[in-house]
Amino acid sequence: MEKFDVHILGCGSALPTLKHWPSSQIINLREKLFMIDCGEGAQVQFRRSRQKFSRLSHIFISHLHGDHIFGLIGLLSTLSLAGRTYPMHIYAHAELETLMKPWLDFFCKGITYEVVFHALPTDNVSQLIYDDRSVQVFTIPLKHRVPCCGFLFKEKAPLPHIRRDMIDYLEIPYYAIQSIKEGADWTTPDGRVFANNQLVFPAERGRSYAYCSDTCYQPQNIPLLRGVDVLYHEATFGKDNAPRAVETLHSTAAQAAQMAKQAKVGQLVIGHFSSRYDDEQVLLDEAKAIFPNTLLATEGLVLNL
């Protein structure tokens, strides 16, 4: 199968620690890179991931809290210093463009490429915001102290592989192969019809990845998340700080696990840990008690979908 990897660059929350970096991830889907959130120091972690800056053209920002955007101006400046010439597309709430324009004008004077801002929807409905031949990206409505949304990456299923034995046996010409891959049947010169499923191997299933941070518990998103291969869900607090989670519109590890269980996802990864936890094992234990296939996010973790 073609590559679909998620690189965790940072999984901490607002207060800096020596253990975790602020929120940021890189998705490598068929060698095309997408960034989710860009906390302070994200470009350093990007370097450490050994992914190529040149393959990044789309950045998705969940919300306008500093621990999710303070690394953005530094990354954009570095790309200009490196001589980038092709556009960078940033998907964020509309206020980010207003905030970033003066910084770009001041710190990135003479920037070598265009920065294109795409305003995220503000209503409480999932919407398609990006579409190419390999993937679709949808918003996930979240509830936080400022407008916020997560992102659902849905890989488009690749075309099925042709059965070489049938192509040779039926002497199907080369020009017809693409249409067969796309679902066409084949009729021989003497009128015999061969159904498409006789001519191809079954196509591989498209994979999916969901990112939900920052948010309180949102069970109404379960239908949207149903069956995703990997769900990254914030777990800022444990049960010991459940009142604080309610107050700040964050989630507990148990709530993240409940979302994963009800949505019947393949794997849960929890992150966005509060700095008050020196050891996140307590969060992992609380989540695994509800959804056993849970991992702790950590910098450098690579998820292979």
PLM features: what roles do these ranges have?
Residues 40-91, 119:
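Active-site metal-binding motif and surrounding structural segment of the metallo-beta-lactamase
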Residues 9, 124-131:
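Local beta-strand/beta-hairpin segments that build beta-sheet-rich folds
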Residues 180-302:
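Cap/insert and terminal regions of metallo-dependent hydrolase folds
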